[in-house]
Amino acid sequence: MKFSLISVFLFAVFLSNENIFQAIADNRYLPTIFKNPVNAEQRSEAVMSSSLTNEEESRNWPHRATRNTLEKGQKRSPAARSEIEEMEEYDDRWMW
């Protein structure tokens, strides 16, 4: 009974969104409280403008910071290449 009530509520919330196809594309399943939701371009610009410094990035995501420093190097050893590939596989596995 609880499951059906919760699922009906979530479905109603999902349908109450003004632009349902935008919500599906952006993975925004719950409606916003604003009348004019921010579109994907505005969100990506905000994210790009608030990019982290290398120090903050290395503190938050050490494997990404390592990849960035390795990519900036002029010559990479085979071990460095394999490390970059492993990190990209890790990102792909856990980001999606």
From Swiss-Prot:
Expression tissues: Expressed by the venom gland.
Sequence segments annotated as region (Disordered): 45-84
Example of a GO cellular component annotation carried by this entry: extracellular region
Signal peptide start and end residues: 1-25
Cell location: Secreted
Keywords (A to Z) from UniProt: Secreted, Signal
Protein family (similarity comment): Belongs to the non-disulfide-bridged peptide (NDBP) superfamily.
Protein name per its UniProtKB record: Venom protein 3.1
Organism: Lychas mucronatus (Chinese swimming scorpion)
